[in-house]
Amino acid sequence: MLLYILLIESRFIMKIKDNFMLIKNARIENNERLSLKAKRRLEKSKADNTLKAYACDWSDFSDWCQYHGVTDLPASPETIVNYINDLADDAKANTVSRRVTAISENHIAAGFSGRHNPAKDGMVRAAMSAIRREKGTFQRGKSPILMETLYLLADLFDEEKLSGLRDKALIYLGFAGAFRRSELVHIQYEDLTFTPQGVIIFMAHSKGDQLGHGEQIAIPYAPQAEICAVRALKKWLDTAQIHRGPIFRPITRVQSLRNTQLSDKSVALIVKKYVGLAGLDEHLFAGHSLRRGFATSAAQHDIDALTIMRQTRHKSEKMVHRYIEQGNIFKDNALNRMYNK
């Protein structure tokens, strides 16, 4: 298994070096009027997670091209159409669309823009339209951890152990702050301000704040102590004696605390562990279940979209309205009115 991982990683690095131009943008590198410092800064215009996603997407396309004996850079429109039609046999429409975006962005970085960009060709757009019509674009997503789920989990944490205290703080804070898992593990002790009303968390960067303006998220004390994120967080920090650095960290089997940051994948594993202990199907849940659960629960409590967005930090109402529709799927059901007649 280790050898396989190393081979995959070495292949990934080779692909980036050979033809993933978003790391080393040709238009930037070949511009003699730009200073080296300016070039390096321009190369950071896209978020790291975006670049990683594009790199994986491009690697898949490049492998497909190599297998079929066709050129990936520059690719022909026909090559892209053939690729996405093969991809659509198993992948969702949204995945196919993201791959086309990655192919397009990489061609732009290599200097193929406008009408010279094969991913913008009318043939590719027509193929994508057909795939969307055939497969649809609805994303099911993971099940939400709702407010009532928090009560269900409350007695499952072993608070005699550091891991139990950490896991409780992580889950309840993740829900209360509607955090993405990457945001949750990046929170530093220095980002916290405790007040008589609760805690304010400063986020320097997030998916919705790519320019780094910074955002503040307020988490008030909950009247119900058993589901209070602020109390759980304070107990965890006090017991673990964390006074600087990442607030969520790995813990060894002998309950020894490490100084490094918890990985975002660990958030999903922790969530799955406790929903499984509660008798729920762990395969239906993931790290995003906390963020989705907050939005869905808020909708069920008739909280308006703008108020929900202040906590979730969504920049568009589209996704929030989708959560509201899902949260009220039974409340606004026509059958309920018929049954009550």
From Swiss-Prot:
PROSITE patterns: CB, TYR_RECOMBINASE. The keyword Calcium does not apply. The active site is at 180, 207, 288, 291, 314, 323 (o-(3'-phospho-dna)-tyrosine intermediate). Residues 140-336 form the Tyr recombinase domain. InterPro entries: CB, DNA_brk_join_enz, Integrase-like_cat_sf, Integrase_catalytic, Integrase_recombinase_N, Phage_Integrase-like_Recomb. Keywords: DNA integration, DNA recombination, DNA-binding, Viral genome integration, Virus entry into host cell. Belongs to the 'phage' integrase family. This is Integrase/recombinase xerD homolog. It comes from Selenomonas ruminantium. The gene is xerD.
